[in-house]
Amino acid sequence: MERARRTIAAAIRDGRFFARGDTGQPVEALQAMFALYGYDLPVSATFDARMGAVVTAFQRHFRPARIDGVADASTITTLRDLIAALPGR
């Protein structure tokens, strides 16, 4: 999980965001983070429709000011902070 956090942190620093159609290790790391937080999301390294639905649901609950299904810095930072606040973290 630490590797996933480092990968995502680097992506945030680079100003990256993730949307449907994106693939690769950073998407895989983000999927692992959503799964760790409790979302039923397979880790496939592909930002597909299912991942888009998870991101949208997450935003609807935790960031209702902007619900667009794009995993931007605000979405990723919120997820990271919520994971850090989990018991035992």
Question: Across the structure, where does each feature detected by a protein language model lie?
Answer:
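Cell-envelope/ECM-targeting effectors and their regulatory/trafficking segments
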Residues: M1-R89
